[in-house]
């Protein structure tokens, strides 16, 4: 669906405004991409940046307030994401009036949901595009400029797998790799399946080709992305045969055979799809990190049933027990929702009990957000805000104490860190650098000026807090890497997908490396 809207005076702001649009010194139009939401959106934003650079735009200078083109890649999971977007759009309205050549585009899940309503709430927006057609952005910008009319284009199904598009990667040392898009589950609180569509999987050959290309550019760590990664393979399975649930485990093992790939992570698995062969692949593949992020959402079986989460608390805890039996030092994290409609104090107590038993390294805890269009929004028993807030605070307090105890147990241990940038907000004040341990924990450490983001160091943990570790005893070893060289030189892997000509069964050559059925 494509619509054009006339460019009358649509801004509610009047009067002269001095433009601060960041035009490149060479006259090239500049861009910014502002991202809300999950890792999938972060990776999609790399694709949007790659598309714009391929079309001749240049990223605005660091610290520039605005650019010639500002793209919002949005989230629709929580109400505060809506409010934040429309608030930021309002802040840009006077700048837009001061420079009519400036363009504003809104994409992602909220755009897929709101469609033309984006223009009704923010009529100074130039382009609205959805989750299925991010490759259309440069064309839509040009069409809006030429026609002097806003363009709304929302596709109802995936037009082109995002990983086949150009990419401007944010990191020289770590990369996202999509293995699937969409979701076949029907959780009552979640709007994502209606916005991202049914699950569509890439073939193993295409995924491994992209990973090899990234490693050739110096990348040390990849994170395999999907709404439900351990359902991988469902879209190219033969419906006439029994479901083969081993495709994701084989993909992990195949990543283990790629020389130069030091770390493999993945997010997020669904407990109902979690099989023992994935645990075995994690434990037996040296470069697969001992880290698991698996959403629990609630510890109450009654609430899980109302959420349409097709597992129960004991099954979830059983998976954790088997993971820890295979990898005793694995860091396990989760997502939790407080205040789902109908949640009683007894239900909440069940969640607290599971959290105590699970001993998560960390938990991303959310207050239930009522989303129009989801079954949960129509349920009776919506919980008063004050009750939700009180339960939320109790849960956070419990989890923070568990996280602190787990981190304190690591004091004195030696860890390997992949040095990162942007992870430590106080690094400049504390003269520390930051990095991630193999289990995903954040460590702030004392280093000298020879250590660069992208390098690997070992150090000893000397202190702990709920959300990070401290290593002030100095660096024990330092390995300079090609990723560190690339970061120092300002180079990023381009990461163009190496062939996503179709979504479907893997080609024949995948079988020898363990990914074909």
Swiss-Prot record:
Q: Name one Pfam family in it.
A: UPF0004
Q: Which CDD domains match?
A: Radical_SAM (cd01335)
Q: Where does [4Fe-4S] cluster 1 bind?
A: 38, 75, 109
Q: In Gene Ontology terms, what is one molecular function of this protein?
A: 4 iron, 4 sulfur cluster binding
What is catalyzed by this enzyme? N(6)-dimethylallyladenosine(37) in tRNA + (sulfur carrier)-SH + AH2 + 2 S-adenosyl-L-methionine = 2-methylsulfanyl-N(6)-dimethylallyladenosine(37) in tRNA + (sulfur carrier)-H + 5'-deoxyadenosine + L-methionine + A + S-adenosyl-L-homocysteine + 2 H(+)
Its localization reads:
Cytoplasm
Q: Which cofactor does it need?
A: [4Fe-4S] cluster
Query: Which UniProt keywords are listed?
Result: 4Fe-4S, Cytoplasm, Iron, Iron-sulfur, Metal-binding, S-adenosyl-L-methionine, Transferase, tRNA processing
Gene3D superfamilies to which the protein is assigned, alphabetical: Methylthiotransferase, N-terminal domain, tm_1862 like domain
Q: What Enzyme Commission number(s) does the record list for this chain? A: 2.8.4.3
Write the signal peptide boundaries.
none
The residues that the entry says bind [4Fe-4S] cluster 2 are 183, 187, 190
| First-listed, main subcellular location of the protein, grouped into a coarse class | cytoplasm
Q: Which residue numbers delimit the MTTase N-terminal domain?
A: 29-146
Record-annotated Radical SAM core domain positions: 169-405
Q: Which GO terms describe its cellular component?
A: cytosol
The reply on keyword DNA-binding is no
Enzyme class, one word? transferase
Function field: Catalyzes the methylthiolation of N6-(dimethylallyl)adenosine (i(6)A), leading to the formation of 2-methylthio-N6-(dimethylallyl)adenosine (ms(2)i(6)A) at position 37 in tRNAs that read codons beginning with uridine.
Q: What is its quaternary makeup?
A: Monomer.
**Entry's family note:** Belongs to the methylthiotransferase family. MiaB subfamily.
Provide the protein name: tRNA-2-methylthio-N(6)-dimethylallyladenosine synthase
Q: Which organism is it from?
A: Mycolicibacterium paratuberculosis (strain ATCC BAA-968 / K-10)
